[in-house]
Amino acid sequence: MTGFASALWAETLKTIRSKVPLFCLIGFSMAPLAGGLFMLILKNPDAARSMGLISTKAHIMAGTADWPAFFNLLTQAVAAGGAILFAILTIWVFGREFSDHTVKELLALPTSREAIVTAKFIVIAVWTLAMTLFIFGLGLIVGSLVVIPGWSVELARTAFINILGTAVLTIPLMSFVALIASAGRGYLPAFGWTILTLVLANIAAVMGWGDWFPWAVPGLFSGAAGPRTEQLGLHSYVIVILASLVGLAATFYWWRDADQTR
């Protein structure tokens, strides 16, 4: 087995055996379950009125009880929830050895640092995409059980593209989370970075600059602020790509040259 294959296998085993990815998946599952509850409330206005604030929240979040509204809710949940839960997974993957003080043992293995970092990024990408696909599948099941109207194969196909596209725009930006978790040698600095980018993304979107701020693009793509054609341009996607590449390159550079004996 090559050094890269060994690193990938080790990272995969760590992910499978840890409860962190499972808890992230459970947390992500709350989105379609809550969406199904909102649809159920909106389908029964008499019962909804007796629920007071819950009914009001459902109207604000979803609006109407149909598949388009349900899919929109899921897409926006992937943008908001993904920014947090994908970051938690990334922080754990890159920060665990520093918090456990086992990074020196990791680097003592006959495997290049580049192979280790690549393996970590691959595990993050595969797991976060798997989480997204799971949420879409769970959403289909929940929506079918609630029996909401407006279903069509074309709508489901469009929703799948929107949800997957939102995730694909979010996942590469985790490269900066990986960098901060590595340079900060633990979890807390990366958590701080995640909160900072969420706050700045909301401010940028409100100020009308979201299309120029990489961390605001996934939320705008999800339709949280209106039709994406009115919010985003080609430059928005280019900025996400460039920012992600900068974070990726900086992470590789840091792992290659940093003194890991401290």
Regions found by a protein language model. Give the residues of each.
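Aromatic- and glycine-rich beta-strand/loop motifs that create alpha-glucan
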Residues: M1-S29, S182
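Junction motif at the cytosolic side of a transmembrane helix
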Residues: K14, L242-R262
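Membrane-helix interface segments
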Residues: K19-P21, S112-E114, T118, L155, ...
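Secretory targeting signals
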Residues: F28-F86, T118-A183, G223, P227-L242
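Transmembrane helix segments
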Residues: M30-N44, G184-F221
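Hydrophobic/aromatic residues in alpha-helical transmembrane segments
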Residues: F86-T90, V103, L138, F176-V177, ...
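Helix-loop-helix units of permease transmembrane domains in multi-pass membrane transporters
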Residues: I91-A125
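Transmembrane helix-loop junction
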Residues: R96, L109, L140, S144, ...
